[in-house]
Design a protein with these regions (language model features):
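Active-site neighborhoods of metal-dependent hydrolases
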Residues: 4-170
Length: 170
């Protein structure tokens, strides 16, 4: 068994690598070949829309973009994203909020690229939520983000484990 990109994503999971590594060692002791890889950094990268509740994308990016133009929908989505009980892998909360979400791609709003959402919002004089939603609308929800969602100690412990190797997605 190969566990690819073994990580503890999001603050609620920090420290749980002790349990997962113990399970891997137990399996190996029982004759099950288990290995893993981990990239040597504390961020994960995907689209910025990954931090929004996924069920609103059922009709595609264009439909979601249209919904994001409505202030009542924005308020509903914000409440869902801020609620840890909302049942989805919440990248916004995993990153500790907008201060941990970095924009690497936003072709229609290039001034956002290279900045955390909070920095970008400050630079344009907007609330981070408004800046995020406006950027998503301008880019038809086709943006890229980097999420600061892991801690150094967890990453280092996994990499030091004899079952692990380094990996990188390029």
């Amino acid at each position: 068994m190969d566990i690819s990109h073994h990580k503890m994503l999001g603050k609620p999971n920090w420290g749980k690598q002790k349990q997962t590594l113990a399970l891997m060692h137990k399996a190996r002791d029982e004759g099950i070949p288990v290995i893993c890889d981990q990239y040597p950094y504390t961020c994960n990268m995907t689209t910025l829309n990954a931090c929004m509740t996924p069920w609103y994308f059922a009709n595609g990016f264009h439909a979601m973009t249209d919904q994001l133009k409505d202030k009542d929908f924005r308020a509903k989505l914000k409440a869902e994203m801020e609620d840890p009980a909302t049942p989805y892998d919440n990248y916004y909360l995993n990153a500790g909020g907008w201060g941990g979400v970095y924009v690497y791609s936003a072709s229609k709003t290039p001034e956002a690229e290279g900045h955390f959402i909070t920095e970008y919002a400050d630079s344009i004089g907007k609330d981070p939520w408004e800046a995020f939603f406006d950027m998503c609308v301008a880019n038809n929800c086709e943006t890229g983000g980097v999420y600061s969602s892991m801690c150094d100690e967890d990453v280092c412990e996994i990499i030091r484990d004899p079952t692990a190797s380094w990996a990188a997605t390029v």
